[in-house]
A protein has these predicted regions:
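Short acidic-aromatic low-complexity motifs
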Residues: 10-14, 19-40
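Hydrophobic alpha-helical core bundles mediating ligand binding, dimerization, or RNAP-core interactions
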Residues: 22-25, 29, 41, 65, ...
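Short N-terminal helix-initiation segments at or just after the protein's N-terminus
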Residues: 23-26, 55-66, 167-171
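Hydrophobic pocket/interface hotspot
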Residues: 25, 37-38, 45, 57, ...
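A solvent-exposed, acidic/Ser-Thr-rich amphipathic alpha-helical stretch
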Residues: 34-87
Length: 176
């Protein structure tokens, strides 16, 4: 550890094993290992899924992984170009699976996104992601009105967050 890193608190130090954390994260989801994924999170950790919303704590995170495998199979998750400063991490990803949803059984679903990891003491305090939900839903052959409902729900959830509400207020002030 160099002098600069030694002067940083443990929370501020770069996570040198962030790529390894991503490998464990992906492997746990692929293997339906909810406990393994939850172990990467802090006790109060939050996994904010792009479809299912926020899951807080080990039991909820493990349950979400089980739900993934109820609605899909043959998961593949690959992370690329990871960067982290010890407090935050980002990685580009490719995610794919075969749908088990009624009416879309066996259809391959693949999309790209960006994962954001808020880190604390070498664990994930919060994970959220950005991807095009419409791309994922369209590959399952869902009707346009169903896709629209899902995307509108995601937009409402996004716009209701305190951060985004403040952003939209600034937009309204600028437009006035």
């Amino acid at each position: 550890m160099d002098g600069k890193e030694a002067s940083l608190s443990a929370q501020e130090r770069p996570v040198s094993d962030f790529p390894d954390m991503l490998k464990k994260f992906a492997a746990a989801v692929e293997a339906n290992d909810g406990a393994g994924l939850a172990a990467l999170f802090t006790a109060d950790g939050v996994y904010e899924d792009g479809f299912y919303g926020a899951c807080t704590g080990a039991a909820a995170i493990a349950g979400m992984v089980a739900h993934f495998h109820e609605t899909g199979e043959s998961f593949r998750w690959e992370f690329f170009d990871p960067v982290s400063d010890g407090r935050a991490g980002y990685a580009h990803y490719r995610f794919s699976y075969r749908s088990k949803v009624a009416g879309a059984e066996g259809k391959p679903v693949a999309f790209e996104g960006i994962g954001h990891f808020a880190l604390r003491d070498g664990k994930i305090a919060r994970y959220c992601e950005v991807f095009d939900r419409g791309v994922a839903l369209a590959q399952q052959g869902f009707a346009a009105d169903r896709i629209k409902r899902v995307v509108e729900k995601a937009a409402a959830r996004q716009n209701a967050t305190p951060e985004f509400a403040a952003h939209l207020r600034r937009l309204a002030e600028r437009s006035a």
